[in-house]
UniProtKB/Swiss-Prot annotation:
GO molecular function terms attached to this record: electron transporter, transferring electrons within cytochrome b6/f complex of photosystem II activity
TM ranges: 3-23
Superkingdom of origin organism: Eukaryota
Name of the protein in its database record: Cytochrome b6-f complex subunit 8
Bilayer topology annotation: Single-pass membrane protein
GO terms, biological process: cytochrome complex assembly; photosynthesis
Length: 29
């Protein structure tokens, strides 16, 4: 596994986490 795949994996994790955080915030959960 090279640094590019690690970077992409980390980016996807952060993006998914922030997206679900926004959805939860708008639902008022």
């Amino acid at each position: 596994m090279d640094i590019v795949s690690i970077g992409w994996a980390a980016l996807m994790v952060v993006f998914t986490f922030s997206l679900s955080l926004v959805v939860w915030g708008r639902s008022g959960l």
